[in-house]
């Protein structure tokens, strides 16, 4: 049986929460929240959620809180890749730790990379991904770390899966 994932978010209440609705000064100032994280599914729910995420990232940065973002592109939530890219290109300049897989970096930010054969060695994956990670870091100098998953489904039962973390400052993957 084929796998089907349903992302029904059209009437979820959180899509109505927008800029000005959250007391960021209370969260990051008084409560001393140390980390703010969100992702592509949330920011694609509505213009309000996208703008709220940008507002939160900026405010977290003002208070010195860590900021992470999972690109997490889902065409079932936002079928328009250009809209998703526009949103993400506004958010990523305020992020320190960015996460996504190869397809996310393409679909959600517009980085086209060489496709890796599913049965490729880890070294081949790493070489191709390292080029992409360095390009993303060059385009977004605010980033400190970029995480990505290396995944090749050989069959329903066999998947090559690993992950890497790119430390931008030391240029180590």
Segments predicted by a language model, with ranges:
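Surface-exposed amphipathic alpha-helices with a cationic face
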Residues: 54-61, 67, 137
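Conserved phosphate/ATP/ADP-binding segment of small-molecule kinases
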Residues: 63, 77-170
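Short, flexible loop segments at the rims of nucleotide/cofactor-binding pockets, characterized by
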Residues: 12-16, 45-46, 74-79, 122-125
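Active-site beta-loop-alpha junctions enriched in small/polar residues
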Residues: 10, 41, 72-76, 103, ...
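Active-site glycine-rich loop that binds ribose-phosphate moieties when present
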Residues: 16-24, 51-55, 81-87, 127-131
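Short glycine-rich, flexible loops that bind phosphorylated cofactors or substrates
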Residues: 15-16, 44-45, 107, 154-155
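Glycine/threonine-rich flexible loop motifs
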Residues: 42-51, 109-110, 116
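Conserved N-terminal subdomain of the carbohydrate kinase-like
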Residues: 1-43, 69
């Amino acid at each position: 049986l084929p796998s089907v994932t349903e992302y029904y978010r059209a009437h979820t209440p959180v899509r109505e929460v927008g800029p000005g609705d959250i007391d960021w000064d209370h969260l990051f100032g008084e409560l001393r929240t140390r980390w703010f994280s969100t992702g592509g599914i949330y920011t694609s729910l509505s213009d309000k959620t996208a703008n709220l995420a940008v507002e939160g990232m900026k405010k977290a940065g003002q208070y010195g809180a860590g900021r992470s973002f999972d690109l997490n592109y889902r065409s079932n939530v936002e079928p328009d890749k250009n809209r998703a890219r526009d949103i993400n290109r506004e958010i990523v300049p305020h992020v320190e730790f960015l996460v996504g897989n190869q397809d996310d970096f393409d679909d959600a930010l517009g980085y086209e990379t060489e496709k890796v054969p599913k049965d490729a060695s880890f070294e081949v994956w790493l070489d191709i991904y390292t080029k992409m990670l360095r390009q993303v870091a060059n385009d977004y100098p605010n980033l400190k770390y970029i995480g990505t998953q290396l995944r090749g489904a050989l069959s329903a039962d066999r998947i090559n899966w690993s992950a890497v973390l790119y430390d931008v400052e030391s240029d180590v993957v």
